[in-house]
Curated annotation (Swiss-Prot):
Organism listed in the record: Clostridium beijerinckii (strain ATCC 51743 / NCIMB 8052)
Keywords: Cytoplasm, Lipid biosynthesis, Lipid metabolism, NAD, NADP, Nucleotide-binding, Oxidoreductase, Phospholipid biosynthesis, Phospholipid metabolism
GO cellular component: cytosol
GN (gene name): gpsA
Designated name of the protein: Glycerol-3-phosphate dehydrogenase [NAD(P)+]
Keyword Hydrolase: no
Location(s) in or outside the cell: Cytoplasm
Annotated positions binding NADPH: S11, F12, R32, K106, A137, R252, V276, E278
Function: Catalyzes the reduction of the glycolytic intermediate dihydroxyacetone phosphate (DHAP) to sn-glycerol 3-phosphate (G3P), the key precursor for phospholipid synthesis.
Binding residue positions for sn-glycerol 3-phosphate: K106, G133, S135, K188, D241, S251, R252, N253
GO MF annotations, alphabetized: glycerol-3-phosphate dehydrogenase [NAD(P)+] activity; NAD binding
Pathway: Membrane lipid metabolism; glycerophospholipid metabolism
Length: 330
């Protein structure tokens, strides 16, 4: 039995907290929202992030970070990507250095273009494990068979986290390509936003297939440029996560894109979704990154112009379709 603290009471963190509690672990959740904390502790629900599902008795919520992390064997950073650094700063010097930090966010730091594990390493001296893959919280909590990947620079810790989370319905693989795993999980959010836009525009299966396939090319292109391995992008954290995020009704990124494709402004679409849409910040970050390192990411480029420069979505699709001819494998 282990004690695991989740810093953030969002949907995926809550789903994993339920999973670990059902394995007879002691689970703490820190959340800054007192209403969320009280609801978890009193009603044993978290309706804001996980509707219609009960929280096991083994889960306790706290408003105090210090209380939540006290005695923890593992700490899970279950906050959005833009909060990762500030959360690490909040626990710096308050935990032993041998406690693994598990990152479940999918994105990069917008202002620095740094992967989230790098951000964590800059602030903390603890081992870092990244847990990523095609895993919507709504399905995990329903015990629908799910597969995911655990990765770290120190594979002993990746294997420990594999054992920690493995259940008959939640299968965890290990992969030593932490760069590829993180980049795949971040860029697929950009492609998922674009997938939602083309759905909102009313395009069909042919268009969606083209977007996913060429989106996969963008993921692998930037991932390899940053040091990831090609085969990683055709695994769970690349192709697998891309498929589920671009096609699922659960995907916040696809839903936001769908609303934008139907004519809603970015601001209004984000309000309608009501939760963090990582693809928006990732789009800006990867647009800046591809400009800096000099690689071609036409889907990301087009989405950026639509989101931040007000360009018409249909005209962006027309431009993509009328680019200079070239080999598919370029």
């Amino acid at each position: 039995m282990s004690k695991i603290t989740f810093l953030g009471g969002g949907s995926f963190g809550s789903a994993l907290a339920v999973l670990l509690a059902e394995k007879n672990n002691v689970v703490n959740i820190y959340d800054r929202d007192k209403n969320v904390v009280n609801e978890i502790n009193i009603k044993k629900t978290n309706e804001k992030y996980m509707k219609d599902f009960a929280i096991p008795k083994g889960v306790t919520a706290f408003n105090s970070i210090e209380e939540a992390i006290d005695g923890a064997d593992y700490i899970v950073l279950s906050v959005p990507s833009h909060v990762i650094r500030s959360m690490c700063i909040a626990i710096k010097g308050k935990i032993p250095r041998d406690i693994p930090i598990i990152s479940i966010a999918k994105g990069i730091e917008e202002d620095t273009d740094k992967r989230l594990s790098v951000v964590i390493e800059e602030e903390l001296d603890n081992p870092v494990v990244v847990l990523s893959g095609p895993s919507h919280a709504e399905e995990v909590v329903m015990r629908i068979p799910t597969t995911i990947v655990s990765t770290s620079k120190e594979m002993k810790f990746a294997a420990d986290v594999q054992d920690l989370f493995m259940t008959p319905y939640f299968r965890v693989y290990t992969n030593d390509d932490i760069i590829g795993v993180e980049v795949g999980g971040a860029v697929k959010n950009v492609i998922a936003l674009a997938a939602g836009v083309i759905d909102g525009l009313g395009y069909g299966d042919n268009t969606k297939a083209a977007l996913l396939t060429r989106g996969m090319k963008e993921i692998s292109r930037v991932g390899i440029a940053l040091g990831g391995r090609a085969e990683t992008f055709y695994g769970l954290t690349g192709m697998g996560d891309l498929i589920v995020t671009c096609t699922s009704m659960h995907s916040r990124n696809r839903r936001a894109g769908l609303l934008i494709g139907k004519g809603m402004s970015l601001e209004d679409a984000l309000k309608e979704v009501g939760m963090v849409v990582e693809g928006v910040k990732a789009c800006r970050a990867f647009y800046q990154l591809k400009e800096r390192i000099g690689i071609s990411m036409p889907i990301t480029d087009g989405l950026y112009k639509g989101l931040f420069e007000g360009k018409n979505a249909k005209s962006i699709v027309d431009e993509l379709m009328n680019r200079d001819k070239k080999s598919e494998l370029f």
